Amino acid sequence: MAKRKIVKKKVVKKNIAKGIVYISATFNNTMVTVTDEMGNAIAWSSAGSLGFKGSKKSTPYAAQQAVEDALNKAKEHGIKEVGIKVQGPGSGRETAVKSVGAMEGIKVTFLKDITPLAHNGCRPPKRRRV
């Protein structure tokens, strides 16, 4: 029997200078997506995809690692300037924003909070009693 060759799709390097970093910080995880100015995804990462399990996904350290991973992938495509859009109430939110600013070779142009706020919409879940 002849073995089948597995052909991997070659990653096309795009040359994009400006982009937007979307940081979604939920209570359970932190997701980071780097897009170009049109909104096409270039690179993404999350605390869960880096191997953090359970309650460790929601830590600020996991958020920092997710940002660094996503931006290192985006640097391969030539990203030099980014704007930051942050969404959600998670604990890794501030750490993620700081680690974008601390990345070498990446200039931050703007910072915007896009957390959706309900104007008396659905009833929120009941408060936890611990």
From Swiss-Prot:
GO terms for biological process: translation. Pfam families: Ribosomal_S11. Transmembrane segments: none annotated. GO terms for molecular function: rRNA binding; structural constituent of ribosome. PROSITE patterns: RIBOSOMAL_S11 (PS00054). It comes from the Bacteria. Keywords: Ribonucleoprotein, Ribosomal protein, RNA-binding, rRNA-binding. Part of the 30S ribosomal subunit. Interacts with proteins S7 and S18. Binds to IF-3. This is Small ribosomal subunit protein uS11. The gene is rpsK.
